[in-house]
Amino acid sequence: MRYLRTFRWHSPLVLTLVVAGLSLPGAGPAAAADACAPLINPIACENSKPGTPKATWDVSGLGSAALQGFPTQISVNVGETVNFKIDSSATSYRVDIYRMGYYGGNGARLITSVNPAGRQSQPGCLSQASTGLVDCGNWAVSASWPVPSTAVSGIYFARLVRTDGTSGASHIPFVVRDDSSHSGVVFQTSDSTWQAYNQYGGNSLYVGSPAGRAYKVSYKARC
């Protein structure tokens, strides 16, 4: 369902990440050419690579109502698997995995594609009338991505793309960590704020029931 007040996860957080790229020094051609030299931060190296045009990876508003989902964990370590629970009325679709970054101003780079289990209509989400909580943890896993041990940490998203002859796509954001790395810079996402404004099911911490807003929200709901 769509409501007048909506919250789009990649604004403004991703704009900050894309502009900064988490690599502060030099942005010119010479800097990009040296970004993958020995002893250079792997994030600077990754962000110097060619990206995917925004027109290819972006979606309009909340994305397609026929493809909505969330990750079972908002954050995974390299080498772990991120699972996606997706409610879909599309007869076929694919899951493209992107990493956010500078990438020559493109904002994201396609990492890989994952084939989902197939069309999957999920059951109604669980709800709690006294608090307004909407929790879709009862959905089944639809697709998974084993994160390579060589993956570069950052904000990623799964782009759900219809392949049944009808256009439509949606995003599922998640974070890839590298718990073995060391850095003088730490980036913290605003994921608790994302969920506070998430109105999937009709409620958020600012609108809905039982008293004009919910008292509890869940990460287990459409992003």
For the regions a language model picked out, list residue spans one by one.
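Proline/serine/threonine-rich low-complexity linkers at boundaries of modular beta-sandwich domains
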Residues: 34-66
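Ligand-binding face of N-terminal immunoglobulin V-set domains in extracellular IgSF glycoproteins
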Residues: 67-173
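Secretory targeting and sorting signals
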Residues: 2-32
